[in-house]
């Protein structure tokens, strides 16, 4: 059932911001030293004519969202950027009002066709992975939720209850979730402290003996230096998978 708090998308714009890494990262057998941020701005309008603009951003992430030995990283990166632009353009043409959950859920119907069009246009072998589609669309999703929260002057996570959502989770999942809403699965107040996970790539130097080139920026380089500097307690370790000794 429609809600007075529903919004429609007035405008959606996608841009790409190049980012160079301080040090190369080895992930999934590939070495990357740069990427792009997919930045999306979305302006929404309420039934009463109020406007707000939200923002969402996500690294392209093709190195993990589209693991393949058939295509180069440059090609999968280009395809994901293409997908992001197309989906954002489609979103800007959606005429109806709704809650961000249903607006974005309806948009997912365009994902498969858009992905097939891109694969054919770039003359790729194989399919455009669903994970890569979701990652490429994620900054749009974040921007729509952000704009919705801003136009109602609330935390967007607090807009996931029956007071704002038009449908319960059974519409998106199955009957087991009848009568349930996303606010039941999210916190109402932010945690004061959360552990920071430090990513350790397969090329990251563990000791001074592993350092090939030390940047002249006074920041830590070895894992031990990072632990001492930031008081790390949680590590996310990426293995190269080619050394079992």
Label the predicted regions.
Residues 175-245:
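Metal-dependent enolase-superfamily TIM-barrel catalytic cores that perform enediolate-based chemistry
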